[in-house]
Every structure is written in C-alpha cells, then in structure tokens.
Design a protein with these regions (language model features):
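Bacterial N-terminal signal peptides
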Residues: 11-23
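Hydrophobic residues within beta-strands of alpha/beta enzymes
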Residues: 94, 234-236, 379
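Acidic/aromatic-lined carbohydrate-recognition and catalytic surfaces
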Residues: 29-220, 224, 228, 239-287, ...
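C-terminal beta-strand-rich structural cap/linker in extracellular carbohydrate-active enzymes
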Residues: 523-543
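Loop/helix patches that line or flank the sugar-binding groove of alpha-linked glycan CAZymes
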Residues: 36, 48, 52-53, 264-270, ...
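Beta-strand-rich binding/interaction modules
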Residues: 495-518
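Generic enzyme active-site microenvironment
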Residues: 141-142, 235, 277, 340-341, ...
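Bacterial N-terminal signal peptides that target proteins for export
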Residues: 2-12
Length: 543
C-alpha cells in the first residue's frame, strides 16, 4: 500500500496547524501557568538510531494533563505546551492512552480509529504535537485497542443490524457455550435479535473476531495510518485476549500468540521500525512466551510491578530478589520489558506505599528502584510528584488532573476540571518541587539522569546478591564492555550497616566502589557502610 495519500493528508493537516499558530501552544496555558524545565537542545542524531526500548517513557492520560481552552478537559495543545517539562525531566518517549472518539471518558471503546476525540483537539493539533515531541527527542506510542471496539462503532452498528459483511467481524451466536468474561460475569451479551455477541470486558465493548482475516487487515490498516503520520509505535491493549482458544480459554491461547506474531510481522513489512509493547497482564513464563514465540518487542512486566510495590510496603527484598533472578532465567536474550510502579489501572505509587498520608521518602525509594533495576521504565504522569489516588475505588481517582502549580486547582485548567484533583496539597505540585533537591520531582530527575549516564543501568543484566538481611537489596547491573553498577537499597525503617565483602557476586568485584549518586557513604570505622532507612544508593568502580 502506498504511503503517498497519508503523506499528502499529513502535509495538509500540518499546514492547517501552522496556520492556526499551534507552534505557540504555550500561550494557550491558563493565566499564570508556568512551563517547567530547562531549554532543550535538538536531540542528537544517534537518538533515533538507538533501540526504542532504551530510555524512559512517560504515560499520559491526556484528558487529565493540561487544559488550554478552559473546558476543564486536558487536550493535545496542553500536552504540546508541557513538552519542555517532560524533556527537561529526561523523558525519551511518551505513551498516550486512547485519544480517539469514544463515548467513554477513558477512550478504550473506540468509535473511529482514524480520528482524534474532539474534546482532546483536532488532527492538526495532534500533528503539531507529534512534530514538537520529535523535536524534543521524544518517541510517541499510541494505545491501539484491537481486541474490541465500541458498540457504537459503525462496524458493530452494521453487524448488529445484520449487514453480512460486518456480521462476521464480531462473534454472534444463537446458543453459545457459557463463557466467563474478564470481570467475572457472562462474556455473552444480548444483541436484541435472538442472538448474543461476545464482549469479554463489558457489553459496550464487543470483541472483534480476529479469526477473520478482514478484521486483522482492518487493524493493520489503522496501525499503518498512524505510522504513516509519524507515530513511533503502539501499546497493544488487552493483547492476551485478542484471539480466544478452541478450548474456551480467553487469555494467552496458542492462537493468540500466533496472532501477535503475524500482526507484528505483517506490520513490519510496511513499517520496519514499528515498535509494539503489549499489555501482558499475566505470569512471567507466559510473558516470556510472547517474546520467545511471538517476537513481541516489549512486554509490560506486571509480576515485577507487584513485587516492587510489595517490597517497599513490607520492607523486605526477599520476593524482589527472587523475581529479578526469575526474570534473568525466563526471558530470552534481548527481550525488552516495560517496568512501572503505577498506571491508569493500578493504585498510584504514592497511595500504594503510604499509610494515612503521602510518605515522600518511600515514594522516592520506589521510584529509584524502578529507575535502577532492569527494564524500560514507564513513569505514570504525576507519580514524579507523589500524586496520590483520590478517595474511593472509582478508576477516575487514579486519573485525576495533573498538579502544575501550588494553587488549589493545580494550574490544570482555567475552568472547572472534568474531575476533582486527588489532592490540594500545595507541596504536591511541579511549582513547589521544581529546583528543590529534597523533592520527589528532583529525585526522579536525578535518577533518570543517572540511568542515562551509565549504560549498565539502562541495558545491563541483574546479578542478585543473596546472603544479606531481608531488608537489604543488592543487585549488580552488568553489561559487556561497560563498568558495572551496584544498586544497594535499605528497605527498612532503620539505619543498617553493610560491609563491602558482603556484596560479592559471580563476575563482579566489590572492592574499590565509590558512590555514583552524590554524597559519600558514611562508615563505622571498620570498613562497613551505613545505609540510612528507606535509601537507595548507586556505586561503581572509581573512574
């Protein structure tokens, strides 16, 4: 398929963007709002030749990031205006949750895969954002919802009405075998004509039938459309559910892995540089199979998320050590894993590791673990400020407006925000934390910079030191041709002492280590180091 029509469309839309002055998007921020982050030089040419799995990504729920038109809903112009902040933080890639038209605020039930939700902006806004992001050296990954559409999508409307072409794009049955969906109820829903249709999540999200080659081709065309416009890749939503098994399995069936392999291979025939990361919400051996058997570029490491969070909660490194060793054994060489400590579906990191009120010290510890251990970190917007969940179990409480300023509204919008902020604490804001070396934000900025400075942190293997107290984590990050880095953390709430001799591991020498991250390590006079409570340090050979 020729890319020329898409390129022509892109040129026309970009011209419209420039004519409307979108490159001056910062001027559209609410009065008094500040743009944080130092001036950013153009990215080096080698940035784009590097592995897209390198660097640090940032997940943006666009609706909650920055509003520029006063309607209380974050938009693409707002995201464009905040790119200097993200680049100044050291971020190298962005994952945007769905930005397509949808009847739902979250966007995971799409009605038009080739358009921008009008509440978030226009296609011209998106292209202006995309060019600006690339100008700051940021890759852009979009959410691609392939498993299901909205029940209001024209495809499903036609299918439900009996259109013979689209009827086979979904799964209808007169008397289907019982099947339990992902949320516990029946996966079959009344179509209103004596039949039922499959929707593994909810009735408003009917499953597309990817056993039909026309459906696969339609989604390949959607992906190619966005890649032609300049998008760098996709996060495949619900990747483990796309094709059900013949035995009724709704997740990780052999046919599903075959679909992942085929979809990736066919997409790269048209776009060799396309980058795919999967929402692999499953066990480590099963995730490894998506790499080994299906060639997935990157998975999300849900098992590591669980043990990272629980390690800080329980002040114990035992399960985290075991998971790191399991990962070293389970994944094939070169498998990229997206790591995270929060996202739009999980409790925010600050809420997960705090008790009655946000505990910045433990939030920093969790963030530094994320940024020092193997994988490609994905930072959920606001986690770098210790933004907590709002009250209650509503998923919207994990997706509240970003706090830019120390004001009650946080500088998100000049109007009434679409959802209340999770906190009005002035200390939890970019304005309050930027430049404060004791803040969570500056701890994240420093940890991201250290990761970029030491290749072993970004791409190295993990060699776990075993014979240590339960609350001490010691992991050597090693990479051929590069100096090793020791990640040393005290997860407990009291100071501990560790002797260098305790940190020996196969292939690495604990002698002659110096701190790589600032202040010297205090000792007790006998050669042991004192590790303060809730602290992570990075050490390496003296250069």
């Amino acid at each position: 398929m020729s890319r020329r029509p898409a390129r022509c469309l892109r040129a026309l839309l970009l011209a419209a963007a420039l004519a409307s002055g979108l490159t001056a998007a910062q001027a559209a921020l609410p009065a008094g709002a500040l743009v944080y982050g130092p001036p950013v030089a153009p990215p080096p040419a080698e940035r784009w030749a590097s592995d897209p799995g390198d660097g640090v990504y940032y997940q943006v729920f666009v609706r909650s990031f920055q509003d520029t038109d006063g309607d209380g809903i974050g938009d693409l112009r707002g995201l464009t205006a905040r790119l200097p902040y993200l680049a100044g933080l050291g971020i190298t890639g962005l994952w945007l949750t769905p930005i397509h038209p949808s009847p739902s605020y979250h966007g995971y039930d799409v009605t038009d895969y080739r358009a921008i939700h009008p509440e978030l902006g226009t296609m011209a806004d998106f292209l202006a954002f995309l060019d600006a992001a690339h100008g700051h050296g940021l890759r852009v990954v979009l959410d691609l919802v392939v498993n299901h559409s909205s029940d209001r999508h024209p495809w499903f409307v036609a299918a439900r009405a009996g259109d013979p072409r689209f009827r086979d794009w979904y799964r209808f049955a007169s008397d289907p075998e019982p099947l339990i969906g992902t949320l516990g109820g029946s996966a079959w829903h009344d179509a209103g004509d004596g039949t039922r249709y499959l929707g593994l999540f909810v009735a408003e999200m009917p499953d597309l039938d990817h056993r039909n080659p026309e459906v696969v081709q339609a989604m390949l065309d959607v992906a190619a459309f966005w890649l032609d416009l300049g998008v760098d890749g996709f996060r495949i939503d619900a990747i483990q559910h796309v094709v059900e098994g013949e035995d009724g399995a709704i997740a990780n069936a052999p046919a599903n892995l075959a679909w992942v392999a085929e979809f990736g291979a066919r997409l790269r025939e048209r776009h060799p540089g396309a980058f795919l990361v999967g929402e692999t919400w499953t066990s480590t051996p099963t995730i490894a199979a998506y790499h080994r058997d299906a060639g997935l570029d990157m998975s999300f490491d849900y098992p590591l998320w669980r043990v990272l969070t629980s390690a800080v909660q329980a002040r114990s490194a035992i399960d985290l050590r075991a998971q790191l060793e399991l990962n070293e054994d389970a994944y094939p060489e070169g498998a990229r894993r997206g790591t995270f400590v929060g996202n739009h579906d999980q409790p925010r990191a600050a809420t997960a590791v705090s008790l009655l009120r946000v505990d910045p010290t433990r939030v920093v510890l969790l963030g530094r673990l994320l940024l020092a251990l193997p994988g490609t970190p994905f930072v959920y917007y606001g986690d770098e400020l210790a933004m907590p969940n709002g009250p209650g179990d509503d998923d919207r409480q994990k997706r509240t407006p970003m706090r830019w300023t120390a004001t009650e509204g946080g500088g998100f919008s000049a109007g009434q925000p679409w959802f209340p902020p999770s906190t009005t604490d002035p200390a939890i804001s970019v304005e309050a934390q930027a430049g404060d070396p004791a803040s969570v934000l500056e701890a994240y900025r420093s940890a991201i910079a250290l990761r970029a400075a030491y290749p072993a942190l970004a791409r190295g293997n993990a060699v776990v030191v075993r014979d240590l107290p339960a609350s001490v984590l010691a992991v050597w990050r090693t990479l051929a041709g590069e100096a090793p880095v020791l990640v040393l953390a005290n997860l407990s709430n009291r100071d501990l002492e560790v002797a260098p001799a305790q940190l020996a591991a196969p292939g690495v020498d604990p002698g002659g280590l110096v701190p790589l991250d600032g202040a010297p390590l205090a000792g007790d006079g006998s050669g042991a180091w004192s590790l303060p409570a809730n602290t992570l340090r990075l050490l390496g050979p003296a250069r």
